[in-house]
Amino acid sequence: MNAPAKTIALTTLAAVSLAASAQQQVVKPPQAQAWIDVATFSGMGMPGMGGPGGGNPMASLGGLFGGGGASGKVSFLMTQTGSTGRYVDVTLLSRRNPQLAEATQDVPAGLLSPALKLVAPRDVPQAPRDDDDVVPERDPQRPQGKLFLYWGCGETVRAGQPKVIDFASASAAEIAQAFQSRRATQRGAHSANGRPHWPNPTDGRALADGASLVGGHAFSGNGVPEGFRFNIPAAQDLMPPMQLRQADQGGAIALSWNTQPSARAFFVAGMGARGRNEMVLWSSSEVPDAGMGLLDYQTNAAVDRWLRERVLLTPTTTSCVVPKGVFVGEGAMLRAIAYGHELNLVHPPRPSDPKVAWEPEWAVKVR
């Protein structure tokens, strides 16, 4: 009685396994890959808080709450500095020519037309693995004192808050949990041997106040496939400056800002101190999150998921109140981010027939 049942089960498993194997599509990496990072930064302050916000990267998929344009020349990876201005970083990879020294990016008339000159750096670390799209997060050092964690917008501190961690007695697991933050940051523009980038010492022109990415772009160079052409729509353009307003509201801090038509979501976080060795963290999330991993580029899927989880503020939100009593010590810093829409283009598109191998000529990520 048992033998036939086993035979049937094994036959079924074999059929499922063969079907799955038959449907597995061969996917090869693109012959050329480009990364384009876009950001707009501005300094922000709060009543009683020391200095402008923006010490850490507050990049968005289409720009941040931002200020005016820069002047003179700019350096590569300004999209990661938080310095006031409007920035674009570009990196190009050619698998046909791993030692590509320079390339050209044709750009629309509104963006330093007619072209950007990309130049590969010298004496830099080896390029990351082709399949390594994740940017590792650094482990935080063990702090001293206590941590007070608050979350949520509103005039008063909610019941059950703050969450307090005493670093003198907390376990490593408790500390890790306290600093836990959602994060889905992937690789973007970067510096590596054989990968030309812009800006660079040869071409470091700053963007004008009215610069725009919208329109046709094209890459060319030794080993770059012909026809590496694509359009960037308005959703991926530099965001306009956010006009952040703040006011005292009975001890709470009321924040409000203008709408951002291309924003996918918003997030606000603050860090402050109370006396010696006491740290205060607050975020606009409806659930506990230290927020440190969220102040960076995130994927569209992650942003949408965190909207459902009420971690991020909706794109129609234009205000948030920091509860009374959260920041009452020696000063604090506020950081805010508007997430735009990440654009991923691949040519040719993936074949619908799984039996046909997918061999892209080029791919580009704009965020």
Stretch-by-stretch model annotation:
Residues 17-21:
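N-terminal signal peptide c-region/cleavage motif recognized by signal peptidases
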Residues 225-239:
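Proline/serine/threonine-rich low-complexity linkers at boundaries of modular beta-sandwich domains
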Residues 251-255:
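Structural beta-strand segments of beta-rich domains
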Residues 256, 261-367:
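Hydrophilic extracytoplasmic domains
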